[in-house]
């Protein structure tokens, strides 16, 4: 039985000098900020989840504490599907996407953590998976006043030296010509055997995305992520049809219903989603299985804390995803939240075989990284 639900708003300020196109354009500039959810059962099990809503963590926290928590107290924590539906239906009139789903995401992941701990099995095995390693690509190439072309080349060369065979670079904040020069400089240093993807973070118009896509085709780019605003699915479908470079997205979509429309309209070639805001592990599994039926690869997105990274990893292992996204820029909410170190082996993330998520929250970490406001 669910005894208590606690939430913690956590902040890390150390990555503000590296920015994507949205931040450069003044549309989304926030510190790394997550909401961690802690669920305790009457028989002493504790599970953890993570939610992300840039700049809106207070609203996520209130949603969990004031709306979701009263629905869940004294419920059977093992009835995860029932509890997901109960939360979704209770927030239907004002939720369905965004903040409410981000809150549900953290709760759902925490419930799966508990389920694994009670069963003494890792989550990926509860989901039917067998994959012990998932190949990772590294997202970098953020814009920074401190990063000239030479430093950009050094950064990407470092990722390859560590054994990663795929990288992703931020674009969209500079002119197309400047971004193409950045990509050419990276290709020179990483060679032809490393996959290079790009991420525009939704900043282009359709016409701009089409023009940039034509340029990216000539460079052999692996995929073009979130070229335009997520809402313009018909236009994204036109891009996917007209461009040779695969369109990837849209991590900013929520739940199986929105992803059904994305796939039905063939708005992407590669599906990307994330446990921290699409509805948790339960919903991401539904999206992943739907992608299999409709012929799409699913590559999990990642950009926040350690709990969501490991949640994504378990789902990727269960779905046999070909890749998973990873970051290596300094982020204490990823690197210092667990007692154990996240295991990387020759460019792959190792799926933990310990119960639940398989990682232990470090004592005092929620107090240490508690947001100041």
From Swiss-Prot:
pH effect on activity, per entry: Optimum pH is 6.7.
E.C. code: 4.2.1.5
RNA-binding is among the record's keywords: no
Entry binding sites for Mg(2+): 199, 225, 251
GO BP field: carbohydrate catabolic process; D-arabinose catabolic process; protein complex oligomerization
Catalytic temperature dependence: Optimum temperature is 85 degrees Celsius.
UniProt activity-regulation remark: Inhibited by substrate levels above 8 mM.
Alphabetized UniProt keyword annotations: Carbohydrate metabolism, Lyase, Magnesium, Metal-binding
CDD domains: MR_like (cd03316)
Induction: Expression is strongly increased by growth on D-arabinose, both at the mRNA and at the protein level.
Reaction(s) catalysed by this chain's protein: D-arabinonate = 2-dehydro-3-deoxy-D-arabinonate + H2O
Cofactor(s) demanded: Mg(2+)
Molecular function GO labels: arabinonate dehydratase activity; hydro-lyase activity; magnesium ion binding
SMART domains per the UniProt record, alphabetical: MR_MLE
Assembly and binders: Homooctamer.
Cited function: Catalyzes the dehydration of D-arabinonate to 2-keto-3-deoxy-D-arabinonate. Participates in a pentose oxidation pathway that converts D-arabinonate to 2-oxoglutarate.
Family named by the database record: Belongs to the mandelate racemase/muconate lactonizing enzyme family.
NCBIfam families, per the entry: AraD_Arch
Name of this chain's protein: Arabinonate dehydratase
Species: Saccharolobus solfataricus (strain ATCC 35092 / DSM 1617 / JCM 11322 / P2)
Species lineage: Archaea, Thermoproteota, Thermoprotei, Sulfolobales, Sulfolobaceae
């Amino acid at each position: 039985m669910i005894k208590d639900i606690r939430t913690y708003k956590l902040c890390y300020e150390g990555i503000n000098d590296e920015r994507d196109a949205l931040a450069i354009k003044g549309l989304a500039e926030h510190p790394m900020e997550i909401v961690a959810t802690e669920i305790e059962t009457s028989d002493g099990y504790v599970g953890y989840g993570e939610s992300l809503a840039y700049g809106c963590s207070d609203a996520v926290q209130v949603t969990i504490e004031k709306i979701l928590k009263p629905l869940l107290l004294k419920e059977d924590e093992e009835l995860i599907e029932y509890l997901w539906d109960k939360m979704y239906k209770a927030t239907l009139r004002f939720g369905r996407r965004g903040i409410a789903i981000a809150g549900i995401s953290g709760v759902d992941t925490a419930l799966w953590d508990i389920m694994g701990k009670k069963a003494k099995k890792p989550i990926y095995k509860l989901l039917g998976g067998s994959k012990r390693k998932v190949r990772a690509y590294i997202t970098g190439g953020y814009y920074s006043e401190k990063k000239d072309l030479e430093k950009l080349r050094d950064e990407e060369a470092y990722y390859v030296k560590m054994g990663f065979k795929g990288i992703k670079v931020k674009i969209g904040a500079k002119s197309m010509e400047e971004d193409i020069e950045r990509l050419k400089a990276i290709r020179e240093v990483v060679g032809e055997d490393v996959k290079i993807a790009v991420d525009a973070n939704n900043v282009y118009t359709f016409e701009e995305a089409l023009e940039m896509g034509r340029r990216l085709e000539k460079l052999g780019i692996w995929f073009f992520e979130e070229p335009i605003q997520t809402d313009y699915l018909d236009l994204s479908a036109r891009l996917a049809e007209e461009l040779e470079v695969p369109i990837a997205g849209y991590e900013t979509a929520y739940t199986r219903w929105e992803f059904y429309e994305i796939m039905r309209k063939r708005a992407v070639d590669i599906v990307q989603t994330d446990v921290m805001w699409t509805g948790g592990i339960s919903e991401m599994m539904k999206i992943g299985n739907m992608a299999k039926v409709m012929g799409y690869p699913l590559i999990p997105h990642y950009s926040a804390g350690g709990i969501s990274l490991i949640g994504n990893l378990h789902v990727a292992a269960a779905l046999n995803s070909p890749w998973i996204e990873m970051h290596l820029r300094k982020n204490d909410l990823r690197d210092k939240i667990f007692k154990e170190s996240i295991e990387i082996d020759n460019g792959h993330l190792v799926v933990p075989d310990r119960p639940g998520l398989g990682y232990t929250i470090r004592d005092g970490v929620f107090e240490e990284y508690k947001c100041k406001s």
